UniProtKB/Swiss-Prot annotation:
Physiological role: Catalyzes the interconversion of 2-phosphoglycerate and 3-phosphoglycerate.
Binding site for Mn(2+) 1: 394, 398, 452
Natural source organism: Natronomonas pharaonis (strain ATCC 35678 / DSM 2160 / CIP 103997 / JCM 8858 / NBRC 14720 / NCIMB 2260 / Gabara) (Halobacterium pharaonis)
Pfam families with a match to the protein in the record: iPGM_N, Metalloenzyme
Name of protein: 2,3-bisphosphoglycerate-independent phosphoglycerate mutase
Gene Ontology biological process terms, A to Z: glucose catabolic process; glycolytic process
UniProt key word Manganese: yes
Broad enzyme group: isomerase
Free-text comment on the cofactor: Binds 2 manganese ions per subunit.
Known pathway: Carbohydrate degradation; glycolysis; pyruvate from D-glyceraldehyde 3-phosphate: step 3/5
Reactions performed catalytically: (2R)-2-phosphoglycerate = (2R)-3-phosphoglycerate
Keyword annotations from UniProtKB, A to Z: Glycolysis, Isomerase, Manganese, Metal-binding
Binding site residues for Mn(2+) 2: 9, 59, 435-436
Amino acid sequence: MEAALVILDGWGLGDGDETDAVAAADTPAFDALAERGATGQLETHGRSVGLPDGQMGNSEVGHLNIGAGRVVKQDSTRVTDDIDAGVFADNEALARAFDHADDHDGRVHFMGLVSDGGVHSYQSHLHALVDLAAERGVEAVTHAFTDGRDTAPKSGVGFIEDLAATVEEAGTGDVATVCGRYYAMDRDENWERTKRAYDAIVHREAPHEADSAVAAVAASYDRGDTDEYVEPTLVSGTDAPLSADDAVVFFNFRADRARQLVRMLADIDPDWAFETDPPAAALVTMTEYDETFDLPVAYPPLAPEQPLGAVLAESDRTQLRMAESEKYAHVTYFLNGGREVAFEGERRDIVDSPDVPTYDEQPAMSAPELTDAAIDHIGADAPDVLVLNYANPDMVGHTGDFEAAKAAIEAVDEQLGRLESAIREAGGHLFVTADHGNADDMGTPEAPHTAHTTNPVPFVYCTPDGTDGGYTVRDGGTLADIAPTLLSTIGVDIPETMTGESLLER
């Protein structure tokens, strides 16, 4: 075994105050690594990862930059640039969707996450679509998915009010349904959740109805449900079930939490345990959600050339990607630059995430089982390079539960200690880092913080003998520097397409 890259998803370096679950946790394994190894910090937000200034990073962007070895201009930025340049209406895939609705006297259905979180969508993109519908004279409706995970738990009503103002000015785009992302954006094959969002959109069947979208969210708060958990709700006066005469524009720019609902709406590989019969609407996705989906894409991927996986394959290295199912896409699709298919010599071992409503109920998640599997691989069929993601700091951090997040950090630390011992015994270099912060700011019980942070993340390097090897970590590093660092450490030439630089210096 040559090297292991361990990604502590959501483990940021905060202020160490009462909101910082990372600092509050007992982390003897990580602390020992940081003491023995070469230790530094990396930036994971804004322009350092191809996002607008000040925009917090996320797991998709983080893994994409880690794998690319260079700063990758994000799809969200491409969309925004077109809107700002006044050429958004010229997009061919979007134009065809509007043409379909216009030619068949149908509607365009906009659906996606309505918030300013910037992780899965921008509300400005939805507002631009509403304005475009008005310009085209096409009737439009919106299926609004509320956030509360990448934004404050009860901020959704404000975003809905902003949308209502745009709709009123445009004269189209009324909200037809409201649904929390817990249902509409599941990514762990909890198909019964997806089906509830599907039924509201396609059949206008939902447990609740409200006079307005704002009232729908307010009623959810009254029931004790925050934005993420808003149950599917129909908005009265907008009788707009989905039909074959209609078009759909799914405006999320991030793929992983959009796939399930798109699969159900387009009847792609229906392996769920109930029958669905969606109408043959013209469906367009803002970005490519899956390269196997035969659907029009408004902004096809600009895949990074020669990501880490490709370079390892070209050098005849074997590699193993490991995570629990919540982070499957990140250690495979995103790390590989938007490629679903494994590279030559790349194996994948994904452990199921626990079947619980929210991960504060099981902060350890599947970290022990994931570590067991990794140690088994290292002992029996060790890859040349292991990439492993621990999901806990991010997934539990999103619940806003400080004590659960603290427990999640401690659970990961325990497993990191076990894994580090196995890697050292196998003679591997160890790199430990994170893709963004989260558990480093949990807010307060009165005002829980469930979103990512813009804090830096750790970067720790240990030689096969568990020391810093005389190296230090330079200042000013970003996620784009990780792949070049790993490659140079194991003696693989860094391709010209990787503009990142090694983080290690003597």
